[in-house]
Each structure stands twice: as structure tokens, then as C-alpha cells.
């Protein structure tokens, strides 16, 4: 039966070795760990590990008088129950049978509905129990299907993708400072010590649930963690070093030990999922479609490079989709970002329109910031988002690839076409 993780003890570990999941092409190995820390009287984090549904999730509750742990538990229980329902199974089965863009959008819509159901359940609990007023929770969960990972996110817990060449922060904290930067609002250069949440499950009348997906390969590692873990990590380079040591259990224990050594100021929880050998082979193997690869190969940053080099560069990228009228942020997950346009169209502030194979914010990849208004998606638009630090990390691992990328980037910026 599906198992959620009892986070009541000081430290707990759940490990499964080389599991086969439904609808997923790879074997996995995973570990989950939680620690109350050295300051908090109780643990308000909750973890969901449900390999029978290819579902993993993490929640960090908030609210006094034990209400935070209630909120986190409600969220985790609701996610599990919603993904268990036949309509969810039908959507995931349809995606695995034919993983086209429309089927992918159906999965995204499902994940948003699941997050919204958790939100509604917490609001209902608050309505019926006065002591629960003010409770809420962060929520991150991932569903593994076909050869991909689908993520849903609300709050400031995080999802990371750790690859041999880079560690990618997939989610953006829904906190005030990060949200203002993403919107292009002038903000201090340094993140303030107080950075309140502006979006989480149960926090307000409505919730916004971010969704994204990544193609997976053997050797990839997925990390879900609460802020008690990521606040204790000095940098993504430091996180990469932690994640390079041993298997999932070693990584989970190492991260919690480090959080305690840094003061144990908060509850700390983590799930580590390793992507192992692939036992299902499909015609539509992992990676960009032939059409998307052709579009990307025509982008100024990647033009003239071999398919292998293009895929190497894309290890730093995450595909995102924006609706018509959405502004395209230049700051995501505490870093400058650039975008490669897969399809759709983007209107720039100067009146120009960028279409497939276009490049947005190329200066971000060398740490420069362009002033002015943000571009806007003119239609539903798919893009590959690349954070500056992730791009630099990929380049550090492959000098030949780095030379090719920076040469193209310098030429593009010198021509003033960015």
C-alpha cells in the first residue's frame, strides 16, 4: 500500500533499492530522511514516498499549536488520494501511451488540480476548527512517468535535478524577494533576512501551483527538500559536492547532518531519488523530439554544433511553457536566466518579435543584466530556461563545449542582436 512518512521522530530513514515503478521506464533507488533539528519543539515537515504510484512529495507546515504539522499531513494525504483516483491514472496512462505535447499539458493540469485540492482541504479544515486558523504548508511533489519527471511546487521547499555535469534548481521560492525579482521589480542586491512567503498551500484564498518536467537519463538524481536543508547549504556548488558522495541514503544523511552542524534551526527533510538502469526501450526515447532538436540547433547559441554537443549544453536547461500575455522573468531561482525559444512567439519591449530558435537574455549567461521592461509571450510559448550558474557548471565540466558556447555567445552579443 502507499506509505507516507512518519516525521514524528528526530531522524528517520526510508530506503528502497532498485525499485520498479508503474508507468516509468527506469529502475530507481531512493531514500527519505527527516530531522526535527535543534531548536523547534516538534517536526512540522511531512514526507510522502509512494513508489506504487511513482509519487514522491514533501511538505513543510506552518502555523502555531501543532497546526503546521496538521496542514502538512493534510496536503500529503490529499496528494496521495488524488493521484490514486481513476481519472488521474487515466491521464498518466494516456501520457505514457503517447507522450505528445497535449498529453503533457493534461498531466500539468492534473498536478495543478491536485495542488489545488490540497489547498481546498486545508481551507476546509481551517473553517471547521478554530485552532487551525493561520495554518498552511509548502508542497512539492513529483510524479515519474515514461522517461520524465513531472513536478508541482508551491512555497519555498525546493526540487533539484543533479546531473554529472550540473546541479539545477528546478523551482523558484514563492517568497516576496524572489517574486519581486522575477517580476522585474527593483530589489536590493542581497536577499533580506526576512523574506516572507507570498504563495503556499492554505496561505491565502487562492494558490498558484507551478508545474514543470524534465527528461531523465541514467545517473540523474532528483532531490526534494525543505528550507531547513537548503538554507544550510552555502551554494549549489556545495550541494553538488554533497550529492556526489555515495547513494541516496548517504546523501540524505549527509545533508541532515550538515543542517544540524549549521545550527539545526529548522525542521529539515529530504528525499533523494536516483535514476538507475533503463529497462523499457521506446521509439520516442528520452531527450528532445527531432523537431525540437532541429529548432534548438538553429539557435545562435547552439548553431553548427553536433547533436551530442547540443544535448550536452541542454543538461543545464529546463523546459517551461508560458501562456499568452505572461511576462518572461530574467531572474529565476535566485539567478539570472536565458531562454531558447522552442515554439510560440515573444514580444520584446522594443517592438521586435522573437519566434522559434530565438534567444532571450543571452547576457544573463555572462552575469550581465539588461534594464527595462520584461518581454511578453505573444502566444502559448515553450522555452528552454538556462540559469547562469547551471550554464557555468556545464562549461566547467567540458572545456571544448565551453569554448564553443562562449564563442557563439560572444559573437551574438558583439553583433548587438541580443
Regions found by a protein language model. Name each.
Residues 5-323, 334-336, 345, 356, ...:
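PP2C/PPM-type serine/threonine phosphatase catalytic domain
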Residues 324-380, 391:
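Cyclic nucleotide-binding regulatory domains
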Amino acid at each position: 500500500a502507499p506509505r507516507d512518512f512518519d516525521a514524528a521522530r528526530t531522524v528517520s530513514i526510508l530506503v528502497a533499492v532498485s525499485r520498479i515503478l508503474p508507468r516509468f521506464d527506469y529502475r530507481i533507488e531512493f531514500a527519505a530522511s527527516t530531522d526535527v533539528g535543534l531548536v523547534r519543539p516538534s517536526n512540522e515537515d511531512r514526507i510522502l514516498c509512494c513508489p506504487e504510484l511513482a509519487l514522491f512529495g514533501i511538505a513543510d507546515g506552518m502555523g502555531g499549536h501543532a497546526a503546521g504539522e496538521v496542514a502538512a499531513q493534510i496536503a500529503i494525504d490529499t496528494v496521495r488520494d488524488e493521484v490514486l483516483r481513476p481519472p488521474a491514472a487515466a491521464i498518466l496512462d494516456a501520457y505514457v501511451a503517447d507522450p505528445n505535447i497535449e498529453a503533457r499539458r493534461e498531466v500539468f493540469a492534473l498536478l495543478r488540480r491536485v495542488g489545488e485540492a490540497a489547498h481546498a482541504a486545508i481551507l476546509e479544515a481551517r473553517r471547521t476548527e478554530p485552532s487551525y486558523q493561520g495554518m498552511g504548508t509548502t508542497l512539492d511533489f513529483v510524479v515519474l512517468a515514461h522517461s520524465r519527471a513531472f513536478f508541482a511546487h508551491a512555497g519555498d521547499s525546493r526540487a533539484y535535478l543533479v546531473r554529472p555535469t550540473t546541479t539545477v534548481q528546478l523551482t523558484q521560492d514563492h517568497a516576496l524577494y524572489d517574486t519581486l525579482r522575477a517580476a522585474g521589480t527593483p530589489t536590493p542586491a542581497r536577499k533580506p533576512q526576512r523574506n516572507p512567503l507570498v504563495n503556499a498551500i492554505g496561505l491565502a484564498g487562492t494558490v498558484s501551483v507551478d508545474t514543470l518536467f524534465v527528461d531523465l537519463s541514467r545517473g540523474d538524481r532528483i532531490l526534494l527538500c525543505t528550507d531547513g536543508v537548503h538554507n544550510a547549504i552555502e551554494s549549489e556548488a556545495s550541494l553538488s559536492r554533497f550529492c556526489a558522495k555515495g547513494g541516496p541514503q548517504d546523501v540524505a544523511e549527509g545533508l541532515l547532518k550538515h543542517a544540524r552542524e549549521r545550527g539545526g534551526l529548522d525542521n529539515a527533510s529530504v528525499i533523494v531519488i536516483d535514476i538507475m538502469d533503463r529497462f523499457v526501450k521506446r521509439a520516442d526515447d528520452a531527450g528532445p523530439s527531432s523537431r525540437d532538436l532541429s529548432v534548438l540547433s538553429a539557435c545562435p547559441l547552439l548553431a553548427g554544433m553536433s547533436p551530442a554537443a547540443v544535448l550536452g549544453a541542454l543538461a543545464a536547461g529546463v523546459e517551461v511553457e508560458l501562456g499568452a500575455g505572461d511576462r518572461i522573468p530574467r531572474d529565476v531561482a535566485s539567478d539570472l536566466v536565458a531562454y531558447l525559444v522552442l515554439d510560440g512567439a515573444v514580444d520584446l519591449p522594443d517592438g521586435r518579435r522573437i519566434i522559434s530558435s530565438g534567444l532571450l537574455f543571452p547576457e544573463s549567461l555572462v552575469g550581465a543584466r539588461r534594464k527595462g521592461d520584461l518581454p511578453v509571450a505573444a502566444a502559448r510559448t515553450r522555452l528552454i530556461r538556462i540559469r547562469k550558474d547551471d550554464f557555468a557548471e556545464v562549461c566547467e565540466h567540458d572545456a571544448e563545449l565551453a569554448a564553443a558556447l562562449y564563442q557563439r555567445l560572444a559573437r551574438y552579443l558583439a553583433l548587438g542582436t541580443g
